[in-house]
Amino acid sequence: MTGRDLAGGVPVLRRLGGAEVPAVRDRLVETYTAVFCAPPWDDSPARAVRFAELLDGWARQPGFVAVLADDAGRETDAAGRGTGADGAPVTGFALGLPTPAPFPADRAYGQVRRLLGPAVETLSDWLEVAELAVHPVARRAGLGRRLLAELTADRPAWLLTVPTVAGTTDFYDAAGWIRHGTGYGITIYTNRPLSR
């Protein structure tokens, strides 16, 4: 099966709010597992369980947004959005939520603070790209860029990635994101310049 087989040509993207996530949660976890529990990431199945827990928490946060690409895009509602009613595989997704103010210190946020110093406060209220995943069968067709662009639209956004995984920094560099630092096992990117 190819990305075109899964997506019926060019995948249709649809935007979901947090209240809509429970209906697609299992499909997102399946795609996450296919992406991150295989090379080049090689995460453990326990990491997929942790992703499901994080997803549940993120979806309850005000301002959470998910952008999905799936085969269900061929069926649309009155607004022209894919309905997803048939449970089609998710070929890719991007997840984001507003960054709290003041900038958090838990999880990887402390490493981001150490890398950016005082400029980190600029990221408060920006959209944090919490996850971007493209199913292996749908890669190399521009879907990752489309998902990222749809998620961030005209909003200031930031993300972190793991530079030791082949292709991650090349992807964001080629997509025009601005690299702001590498250290502590992460690389930080924004889609616009930071105020210093």
Regions from the PLM with identified roles:
Residues V29-P45:
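Helix-loop element at the rim of GNAT/NAT acetyltransferase active sites that forms part
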Residues E131-A153, D173-A174:
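Conserved acetyl-CoA-binding loop-helix of GNAT-fold acetyltransferases
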Residues R145-R146, P163-G185:
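Conserved active-site alpha-helix within GNAT-family acetyltransferase domains
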Residues E53-D71, P98-D106, E128:
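A short helix-loop-beta-strand connector motif used in the catalytic cores of GNAT acetyltransferases and
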Residues M1-D26, E30, A34:
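Conserved N-terminal entry element of GNAT/NAT acetyltransferase domains
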Residues W126-L127, A153-V165:
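Conserved GNAT acetyl-CoA-binding A-motif
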Residues G63-A94, H135:
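Conserved beta-hairpin
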Residues L95-E131:
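Conserved acyl-donor/pantetheine-binding loop and adjacent beta-alpha core of acyl/acetyltransferases
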